[in-house]
Amino acid sequence: MVQRFQPATLSLEELPPIDYIVISHDHYDHLDMRSVQFFRDKEATFLVPLGIKSHLEYWGVASKNIVELDWWADHEFEGIRFVCTPAQHFSGRTGTNQTTLWASWIVDSPNSKIYFSGDSGYDEHYQKIGDQLGPFDAAFIDSGQYNERWREVHNLPEEAVQAAIDLRAKQMIPIHWAMFELSLHDWDEPIKRSQQAAEELGMELMTPKLGQVVDLSLKNQFSHWWEQVQ
């Protein structure tokens, strides 16, 4: 199995109470059985794309705690609206079983509107989402583990920044770059390229340390912490 760059900042047991969990797709680095079963026992609600409900039910999650949605469908809990939106990726727990949907998500609350890309290559879906459902206070966008040969399923860093612009996001948080090594680039190349592209295109980049708590309502200042990693 692929190893993490470093141990998790917090254990599952140290996390605060979690009410809702969105799942982008069923690849192993995005859908972990042990984590699902931990939150199953906490009665968390899972929001998943089509086909993934069967995984969760097999792992013992009650049907009442699963909301399965197609692209552009939404569901509301306690004033928080969750929208399942398109992504450009693929799925499957094995190399041949690709019968489940992949997705990005919007979490729209009275306090903020957040976009989460899941895994995705760059395409016109970002512009469509921005036009129909934007703007966003912050966008978490796939910015790592890319390669020119598979750019259709993982954004290049420059494309990720352009995606944030297409989405009409006020701020972008690069994700999918500092946990697992799944490509051939240096571990910090994604953030360096994202930083340069953001400066050139005028996008505000948020680069918190792993585990750092961020208040989106504040003007946050972030160090280039990756430059200090040996």
Predicted regions and their residues:
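Cap/insert and terminal regions of metallo-dependent hydrolase folds
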Residues: 4, 20, 45, 51-54, ...
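Residue-level marker for buried hydrophobic side chains located in beta-strands
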Residues: 114-116
